[in-house]
Each structure stands twice: as C-alpha cells, then as structure tokens.
C-alpha cells in the first residue's frame, strides 16, 4: 500500500509503513515556537564543569522550561540531574543509517525530518527539564555526523524552550566544528591552577576565531579552598578573562557521590548551589 504525501517541504509517494513518520512530524513541526536563551558551560576536564552545568539547569528550571544538552561523550549530566539516560544522538544516527540501508525508510523521505523525529524520541522528558545526550562519536577521530545531528537538534528543539544549556565536552569540540550556531552566554569553568586559567584563555581565543557569535564570555573559578592566590588573579587579568564567580570547594558533593545521589539534591547552604545562584544573578539569566 502506497500513500501520496504533500507538505511544504515534501511531495511524493511513500509506503504506508512510513506514514507514522509524517504523522509524528506534523505534530512536532506544528507547535508554536519561541526562541530560547542558549548557554554553554565549558572547561577542561576535571574542573567540575558538569556540576556547574547541572546546578545551573536545575535553578533555571524554576524560571522556565530548560533543554539540557549533554555534549560530552562520557554522558554524566543525566546522573547529576537525577534523570535516566535515554537513546543518544549517536545511537539515533546509527539507527537511521541502518534503516535507510535496509530500505525501511525510503530515500525519498527527507532525512532532516526523520532526524528531527528521532532526536525528539531521544529526549528524556521531565517536568521542567528535557535532556538530550550526544553520546559516543561515530568512530575513531570522527564526530562529524553526530555533531551535525546535535546542531540540527539545537536549531529545531531550542525554539520550544526558555533556556538551552549545553554541557560542553572538554575543548568545546562542538563549537569548533560549528555544531552550535550562536551562543548567548559562554561560561568557562576553571580550577585554581594556572593551567586551568590558560585553558580558559585558549577557549576564549578559539571563540574569536570562529563564525559562532557569542554574546558574553564569563569565567568561573571552581573548587577554591582559600580564595584566589595572587598568581591566579594576575593570570586572569593578563589573559583578559572576566571573572564573575569564585566557588569554594563543596564538601556536600562527596557525600552525595558516596550515596549515589544526584547533585541537584545539594542543600541550600551548599557552596556550589550558592555559587551558581551568584552566576545567574550576575548574568541576569
């Protein structure tokens, strides 16, 4: 059985077995949309970037609906948020490729529409936070196809949310490969080391070399045990970084980790929670 389909983007004959793709897409594309504020949290590995991103997502969800994107292949954001890990973007990509090769999806069906539908199915939905995980790269040294899907997801999905918060992989690979179009706020997280500040400065320089537009770049120094040493303060000034928050070492994080609890259960007096509140206030998010 074949069905004639005619939309603004596609006109043609498909098999009846493929009709559910279009029914799903019509509902998806028919929603009224509004632009989201896009925030990227970046930093070298081991500085507590995901912890900052998780608390930022949780606190912003009290103000609006948040799309949380885990762009780190290690996919730890779901644990920090206390959410299950659903199908990843990379897995969805593999399923679509296999379905096309086996003829389950007709080559005449717009691939972008099918991608959009699969990305939506990969969303882990909760009350005020939806999570999309990037997952593993396509193969050794290649992240291109999955990155393209992530960009597609951001472009289409973000319009349905008040905030889009991206937990970037170390080095901001998705930005350097133009996965993210424009960013309203880039929060670079560093620890209290010269190496961390230098990495933050390199990220800031990388942004200036790319076509990606970034509205504001801000530095957050995490896990401070006793303020900032003069050497760190001098390095921040030397590299022209804008420091907006210094977050003390948080003893509650280790306690939650030992009990297998998510970071969003940090108490109100948690240094990390208070520090992220300061970030939101200073950036007027």
Where are the language model's segments positioned?
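Conserved catalytic-core segment of NTP-binding enzymes
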Residues: 62, 145-249, 255
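Walker A/P-loop phosphate-binding motif and the immediately C-terminal alpha-helix
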Residues: 37-73
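C-terminal boundary of histidine-terminating zinc-finger modules
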Residues: 260-268
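N-terminal phosphate/diphosphate-binding loop that engages ATP/GTP or pyrophosphate donors
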Residues: 61-125
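Cytosolic-facing regulatory segments adjacent to core modules
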Residues: 111-121, 125-126, 130-168
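Short hydrophobic targeting helices and cationic amphipathic motifs
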Residues: 1, 11, 22-25
């Amino acid at each position: 059985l074949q069905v004639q389909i005619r939309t603004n983007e596609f006109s043609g004959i498909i098999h009846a077995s493929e009709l559910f793709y279009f029914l799903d897409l019509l509902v998806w594309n028919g929603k009224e949309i509004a632009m989201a504020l896009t925030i990227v949290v970046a930093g070298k590995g081991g500085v507590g970037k995901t912890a900052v991103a998780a608390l930022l997502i949780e606190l912003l969800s009290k103000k609006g609906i948040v799309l949380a994107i885990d762009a780190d292949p290690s996919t730890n954001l779901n644990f920090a948020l206390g959410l299950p890990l659903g199908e990843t973007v990379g897995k969805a990509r593999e399923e679509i490729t296999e379905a096309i090769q086996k003829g389950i999806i007709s080559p005449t069906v717009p691939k972008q529409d099918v991608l959009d539908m699969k990305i939506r199915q990969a969303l882990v939905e909760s009350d005020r936070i939806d999570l999309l995980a990037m997952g593993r790269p396509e193969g050794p040294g290649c992240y291109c196809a999955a990155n393209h899907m992530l960009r597609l997801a951001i472009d289409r999905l973000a319009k349905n949310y008040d905030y889009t918060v991206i937990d970037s992989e170390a080095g901001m690979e998705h930005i350097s490969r133009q996965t993210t179009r424009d960013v309203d706020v880039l929060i670079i997280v560093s620890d209290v080391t010269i190496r961390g500040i230098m990495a933050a400065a390199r990220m800031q320089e990388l942004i200036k070399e790319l076509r990606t537009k970034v509205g504001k770049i801000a530095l957050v120094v995490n896990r401070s045990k006793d303020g900032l040493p003069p050497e760190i303060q001098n390095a921040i000034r030397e590299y022209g970084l804008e420091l907006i928050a210094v977050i003390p070492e948080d003893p509650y994080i280790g306690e939650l980790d030992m009990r297998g609890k998510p970071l969003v259960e940090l108490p109100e007096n948690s240094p990390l929670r208070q520090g992220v509140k300061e970030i939101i206030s200073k950036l007027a998010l």
